[in-house]
C-alpha cells in the first residue's frame, strides 16, 4: 500500500485520504473507466457530486501546507485547524498596532478592517448549517489587575461574539474555569488547554466543534482488516470502502472527494511517490481544480482517531510573526499596555468512521506584561511524523478549518 496523505480542511472542509492499501497506487482501467483506489470491488450507486468552485485557493492552501510541513518535521501525525488559528490571531490583530499589526496582517493576508468583516461573515455562515454541527466560540480571559480597554472588549463582544471574563489569574481555580469552557465548547473532546496561569495576564481563545455525517455513509459490511504502511512499519487497520464520483489528479498526486451534508466535503489525497513528502510539493490548489466526474472512483479510507497538541510560536515565527512574541517590540496597545504573546497553544481532535466525522480545535493565545516578562524559554514543537495529510473544506469557498498529516494509526 502506498503511504497516504489526508489533507483535511473545515470551512473549506476537505480531507485528503487514503487509497489502495494493497495495489501500490491508483490506476485507470480502460475497459471500465474505473479508478482503482482499493482492491475491494464495491458496487454502489454513485450520486453526481457538485463541483467545488475554482475560487482562489492559492494563498490559503499554500500557507496551510507550509505550516503542516514545518510542524511535520518533528511528527508523524499533524492535525491543525486553520480556521481556529486564524480566528484567534484575528482577535489579537484587533488590538495590535504598528509593526505588530503589519506582521499579523501579512500572515492573515488581510488588513485589520478586511479581517473584521471576513470573520463576522464566517460566524454568520456557521449559524446557517442545518444538517451538521458547526459551532464556533470565542472568549477573552484577563487578570483583574489588567486594564483592558473598553473599546477592545466591546469590539470582541459585538464582532466575535466573545465571552469576556475578568478573573484572578493567581487563583488556581481560574485554570479549571478556562479548561471547563474549552471542554464545554468542544463537547468534551478537548477537556484542557492550559495547565497554569502563572505569568499570564490574558488569554484569547477560539474553540471550534464540527460533526457531520457522510451524505452517503460507508457500508459497514465493506470495512475490512487491511495493511497500512506507516512510517513506523506495517499496521492492520479497519479500511472503509466506497465508490465516489469525483476524481482528482495532477503531476504529484491522485485523490477523491466524498461529501458531507451542507456543502462540506472530505478530500482524500494520495501522493504518487511513496515515502516522505511535503504538502507544499503536491499543489493542492491545482489538484482540487483538476476534479472530474468521468470515472467511478473506488476508494479506501482507514478509520482513524487523532489527538494533537503543539505550540505554534516556532512555526509562526518562520512566517514572519516576530514582534508579537518580543516583550521589547510587541505593540498591543489596542488591548492594554505592555502586553506580548507568550505562547499560542493549539489542540485538535478528529475521528473518522463509516458514519461521518467529528472534529474539534482550540487555539489559546496567552499574553503577559512585558514589564514583568520572565526569561524566555526555548520553544519545542511536539508533533508526530509522516505519511498522510488531511483537511476539511466547504465546497464554495477556501476557508480552512482542519488539516493534517497522518502516518501511524493506533487501534
Question: Which residue ranges define each predicted feature?
Answer:
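Detector for small/aliphatic-rich hydrophobic stretches
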Residues: 5-8, 13, 18-169, 406
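Non-catalytic, conformational "gating/processing" segments within enzyme and secreted inhibitor domains
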Residues: 75, 118-272, 292-374
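Extracytoplasmic/secreted cell-surface and envelope-processing proteins
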Residues: 100-102, 275-278, 308-310, 360, ...
